[in-house]
Structures are given as structure tokens and as C-alpha cells.
């Protein structure tokens, strides 16, 4: 749960990236970044011919901080696809966070690209020390048994269920309205 005096940012990295800033438990600002999981998944899918394999590649990719990055770049052939998108997202998110009239105390990461290992360390490094962590549903107990990636998949499942039940915003990342649903009634 968010503390009343805490100013936070939520970076949702799905098709496109959304940065939501919250202050005093109220949404203050929502901005979008055109880069997102879609461009990474599309690029990997073009080589692998499978979106599920592209997702698994992201899930099994580990990114490293500046000090140890050079030793591991050969380890994953898709780092060259994933890192530029994450770099764009993190730098634009940093600009958005720094432009707020109040200091952001914590950044939560969520969405498809948050399955990349060490992504919170990568964002912390670029956002200069603001604490970053993966957004976890409040009702799931934290324990060493639960893999952080399970939280991310639970977040996605909850969002899909809410959309499927007709709640939430129909134009958000998880549910696309059919063209016929967008037409005004006559």
C-alpha cells in the first residue's frame, strides 16, 4: 500500500509505456512514452516467429549494471534488442520524474517488460538512486518461495480479468475495443 506522504511513479511497460505519478494517494499526472514491450516483442518475434518465445526470452534475460555489463553482453543475443528500448524508456521516465514539482520517493515497475531480470537495478542506476521495485499485488505474501516474475504475471492476469468483466478503461493496453464498439449509437 502507498503511504499518505509518499510520492511515487508507476512505470507500466506494455505495448507503450505509461508513467503515472501519484502524490498524497491521488493521481497527479499520466504521461505516455511511445517505446514499450511491443517493439521488443515484435523484433524478437521477427527472428523467432513466436510471441510466446519472445516473452520467454525477455523473462530469461538478465541485464546488468554498468560495472559488470561488458562481461555479459555476449551471453544473450537479444540484449541488443532489449537494452535500447529499456534505455529509451528509462531516460524518458527519468525526464518525466525530474519534471514533477515534488520529489518522487519510489518508482514501481510493471508490465510485460518488467519480467527482465534486474530491471529494477537498471532503472535505479539511470534514475539516480530513486528506489525502484517491481509492483506486487498487496494481497500476495512476500516470501522467498514466490518468484518476482509470478507477481508480474498475476498483475497481468488481474488486469485481463478486470477488462474481461467490463470494468476499468476499455482503451488500456490489455483490452482493445472492436471497431464496432467505438462507433456512436444512432
Predicted feature locations:
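Hydrophobic/aromatic-enriched cytosolic interaction surfaces used to assemble or bind macromolecules
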Residues: 1-186
Amino acid at each position: 500500500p502507498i503511504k499518505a506522504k509518499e510520492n511515487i511513479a508507476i512505470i507500466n511497460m506494455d505495448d507503450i509505456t505509461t508513467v503515472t505519478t501519484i502524490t498524497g494517494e491521488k493521481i497527479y499526472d499520466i504521461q505516455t512514452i511511445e517505446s514499450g514491450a511491443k517493439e521488443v516483442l515484435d523484433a524478437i518475434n521477427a527472428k523467432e516467429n513466436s510471441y510466446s518465445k519472445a516473452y520467454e526470452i525477455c523473462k530469461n534475460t538478465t541485464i546488468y549494471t554498468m560495472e559488470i555489463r561488458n562481461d555479459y553482453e555476449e551471453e544473450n543475443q537479444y540484449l541488443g534488442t532489449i537494452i535500447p528500448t529499456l534505455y529509451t524508456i528509462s531516460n524518458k521516465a527519468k525526464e518525466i520524474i525530474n519534471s514533477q514539482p515534488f520529489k518522487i520517493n519510489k518508482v514501481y515497475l510493471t508490465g510485460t517488460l518488467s519480467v527482465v531480470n534486474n530491471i529494477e537495478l537498471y532503472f535505479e542506476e539511470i534514475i539516480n538512486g530513486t528506489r525502484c521495485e517491481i509492483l506486487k499485488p498487496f494481497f500476495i505474501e512476500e516470501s522467498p518461495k514466490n518468484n518476482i516474475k509470478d507477481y508480474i504475471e498475476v498483475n497481468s492476469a488481474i488486469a485481463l480479468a478486470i477488462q474481461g468483466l467490463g470494468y476499468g478503461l476499455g482503451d488500456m493496453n490489455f483490452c482493445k475495443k472492436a471497431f464496432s464498439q467505438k462507433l456512436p449509437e444512432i
